[in-house]
Amino acid sequence: MESLSELQNPLLPRSPTHLHGPYPYPEASPAWPCREKIYSYLLGGAGPAHAHQLLDPGSLQLAVEAWYRPSCLLGRDKVKEPRPGSCETSFTEGREPPAGPTERSTEPGQAEEDVAIQTVSYGVQEEFQGQEGDPEEEESDATSTESESEDNFLTLPPRDHLGLTIFSMLCCFWPLGIAAFYFSQGTSKAISKGDFRLANTTSRRALFLATLSIAVGAGLYVAVVVALAAYMSQNGHS
C-alpha cells in the first residue's frame, strides 16, 4: 500500500534524494550558462554596464527559470489566471421588467378618471339637452293640452239649452225665442246622430239667440213701464 506522502503528492518522484530545499522541484544543472548572469543581476553585482540598466519585465521569469528547470515548472495557466489590473466586461441581454403590475396599478386610476370624465360629460350633455328640450317640452305640453281640451270638448256632448230657449220664447221677445228653440231642437238631433260638430254649432246659436231674446225682452219691458208711467203722469196733470 502506498504511503501517505505519495497519496498527498502523486506527481512527485518516489526518491526525493536529488531534491534540495523545501521546494519539490529539481535544481538546474550547474553547467547552465545563464545562471551566473542572473545571480549578478538579482544580487546587485558591481559592474559599470549594470549601474544604469533599467528593469526588464522578463527578468522575473528568467530568475525563476534560473533556479528551476523550465521543464519542471508548475504554475497556473496564464490564459485562465485573472490579472489584478484587468477588468472583464460581459454583455448580457437586459430584460425589461414586466410592466404588468405597473400597468395594472395605473389602470384603476385611469379607469376612475375616464369614469369621472364620462360622468361629467354626460352631466353637461344632459344639462344642455335639458335646456334645449325645455321649450320643446313646453310646446309639446301646450299642444297636448290643447288637443286634449279639444278632444274633451268634442267628446262631451254639447247642451241644447232647451229651458233657456223656452223662457226666451214665452216671456221675452218671442221671435228670437222661437229661433233659439229651433236651434235647440237641431242640437238634440245632431247629438242623437253623433255629429258633435253640428251639435256644437247649433248649441252656440241657440244660446246666442236665447240670450239676445232675453236682453231684447228686458229692454221692451223697461220701455213699456216707462211709457205707462209717463202717460199716467200726463193724465194726472190734466
Swiss-Prot record:
Q: What is this protein called?
A: Synapse differentiation-inducing gene protein 1-like
Q: Which residues lie on this side of the membrane: Extracellular?
A: 1-162, 227-238
Read off the lineage from the record.
Eukaryota, Metazoa, Chordata, Craniata, Vertebrata
* Cytoplasmic side of membrane: 184-205
The listed locations are:
Membrane; Golgi apparatus, cis-Golgi network
Tell me what gene encodes this: SYNDIG1L
Membrane-spanning segments:
163-183, 206-226
Keyword annotations of the record: Golgi apparatus, Membrane, Transmembrane, Transmembrane helix
GO cellular component terms given for this protein = Golgi apparatus; intracellular membrane-bounded organelle; membrane
Specify where the region named Disordered lies, as residue ranges.
1-24, 78-111, 126-155
| Pfam families in the cross-refs | CD225 (PF04505)
